[in-house]
Design a protein with these regions (language model features):
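Positively charged n-region of N-terminal signal peptides that target proteins for export
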Residues: 1-5
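Bacterial N-terminal signal peptides
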Residues: 7-17
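N-terminus-centered regions that define maturation/targeting leaders and the start
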Residues: 21-187
């Protein structure tokens, strides 16, 4: 019976969309956002009809597994009416000793990122953070903020000018664990 328990548990987790990496105890918190709460105007985009502060939230994480050689952070809106979601922010090659990013780190001009970290182009076409700005009248969108523990120092296919979707694809092969915090925003 014990021989069947592990394969059955793995199968059930796969059906639920979970993985062993998700179950390793990694956590993500923010002083600027609680799980399931509305994102503040401070983080909302300043453009495309939105008038926010466009500041990336402060993020802190813990519980990275042994073998973590770098981190990546993303903010993704799966509710965007594009058919494939919308990438608001992707940062990769964050050094392994890093456990937080300060508020506003997504502004490439401020140079608040740890040395070696790369901010890719978001789906607005700019490098760094682009805050929430869903179409007016849409139901609130879910903004998934995820930190990834990565098994390589530098993602092999992602370069300085990499599109966010390419970085995401590269992360699929190199993620040891991840943690997600979801915020909501609508207008």
């Amino acid at each position: 019976m014990a021989r069947l328990a592990i394969p059955i548990a793995a199968f059930v987790l796969s059906l639920l969309g979970a993985s062993a990496a998700d179950a390793q105890g990694m956590s993500l918190t923010s002083a600027d956002l609680q799980e399931g709460a509305t994102i503040s105007n401070e983080q909302v985009l300043n453009g495309f009809g939105c008038n926010g502060g466009n500041l990336s939230p402060a993020l802190s994480w813990s519980g990275a597994p042994p073998g973590t050689r770098s981190f990546a952070v993303s903010i993704f809106d799966p509710d965007a009416p594009t058919g494939s979601g919308w990438w608001h922010w992707v940062v990769f090659n964050i050094p392994p000793g890093t456990t937080s990013l300060p508020k506003g780190a997504g502004d490439v001009k401020k140079k608040l990122m740890p040395k070696g970290a790369i901010q890719s182009r978001n789906d607005f076409g700019a490098y760094g953070y682009g805050g929430p700005c869903p179409p007016a009248g849409d139901k609130p969108h879910h903004y998934q903020i995820t930190v990834f523990a990565v098994d390589v120092d530098k993602l092999p296919d992602a370069k300085n000018d990499a599109a966010s979707a390419l970085v995401s694809s590269d992360l699929r092969s190199h993620t040891l664990a991840k943690a997600t915090l979801t915020g909501l925003y609508g207008r």
